Amino acid sequence: HLFTARSQPMYRDFLTSVYWQACSDGRLSIGNDDASRFLLRALDDGQMVKRWNESTIRRVSSYLTGCCADYGLLEPGARRIRRILPYGIMPPVIVYLAYDLHFQGIGDNSMLSHEDWGLYGLDRDGTLDELKRISRDGHFIIQSAGDAVRIAWKYANIEETCRAIAGR
């Protein structure tokens, strides 16, 4: 999910502007028509270099909803409309993503607002809440007061982080 979204900006944008918005609106399903409208809006806004034909839009719309189904955000199967499934970020993913952003050189405060958290429906406050909850597992110590956040990191590199997450 994370690496697909990082390598496929269209999938990332679909998640943050369509999927999570639908969840926020209390919708029960997302269909290929929602994905098609998303793509047409992107084309109209000039976000793509070349205008796509209708068959390409249909195929990519199906790809977007299919990816969401593959990652457990939407129900599986070959459907034009799919139910939204309960989805939340898992504790190991929170730890991995926090350390990944840290090792990229992103500061503690900036990390909370990084766009990758939006892939899991989290804004800055939601991210801070999740990090505080997970800090009880001992992967890091987090302190916050107002807008200031300080994290004491326990692991020296991503390999050490992955070993700790895996329990080795």
Model features per residue range: what roles?
Residues 155-168:
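Low-complexity, glycine/alanine/valine/leucine- and proline-rich hydrophobic stretches
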Residues 1-28, 90-106:
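Positively charged, polyanion-binding regions of nucleic-acid-associated proteins
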Residues 69, 75-158:
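Accessory, usually C-terminal, subdomains that scaffold auxiliary metal cofactors
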